């Protein structure tokens, strides 16, 4: 290996072992990730692309959140309602990302 290649290899971060490895694994293997975002919603989808700021392009996303209906004074507390919606493609800005997990249910990879 030439000297220039050695220097280039040293400067390049290793995404296979670092904190972005879950995102890299999702891109390479087409696996789902669960992303907790700042608006108290969860995104379950497949990562198509990402950068070091955790900006992401996601596909086949299920957005999940809980709403508590408002009640009149003196009435019982309303039960929380789980809601979700499907988003085929989206761009997620990295500053809203709190946590990224491999899909806890382990859904199989989806063919393109």
From Swiss-Prot:
GO biological process: mRNA splicing, via spliceosome; spliceosomal snRNP assembly
Main location per the UniProt record: nucleus
Domain Sm: 20-106
GO CC, any one term: U1 snRNP
Positions of disulphide bridges: none
Subcellular location: Nucleus; Cytoplasm, Cytosol
Keyword terms of this UniProt record: Cytoplasm, mRNA processing, mRNA splicing, Nucleus, Ribonucleoprotein, Spliceosome
Stretches with biased composition (Basic and acidic residues): 1-15
Region Disordered, residue ranges: 1-23
A GO molecular-function annotation: RNA binding
Similarity annotation: Belongs to the snRNP core protein family.
Its biological purpose: Plays a role in pre-mRNA splicing as a core component of the spliceosomal U1, U2, U4 and U5 small nuclear ribonucleoproteins (snRNPs), the building blocks of the spliceosome.
Protein name per UniProt: Probable small nuclear ribonucleoprotein Sm D2
Organism of provenance: Dictyostelium discoideum (Social amoeba)
Gene designation per UniProt: snrpd2
């Amino acid at each position: 290996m030439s000297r220039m290649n050695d220097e280039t290899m040293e400067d390049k971060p290793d995404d296979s072992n670092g904190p972005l490895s879950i995102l890299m694994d999702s891109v390479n293997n087409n696996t789902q990730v669960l992303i907790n975002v700042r608006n108290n919603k969860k995104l379950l989808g497949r990562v198509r692309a990402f950068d070091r700021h955790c900006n992401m392009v996601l596909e086949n996303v299920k957005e999940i959140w809980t709403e508590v209906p408002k009640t009149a004074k003196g009435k019982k507390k309303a039960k929380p309602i789980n809601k979700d919606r499907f988003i085929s493609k989206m761009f997620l800005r990295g500053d809203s990302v709190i946590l990224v997990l491999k899909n806890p249910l382990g859904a199989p990879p989806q063919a393109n």
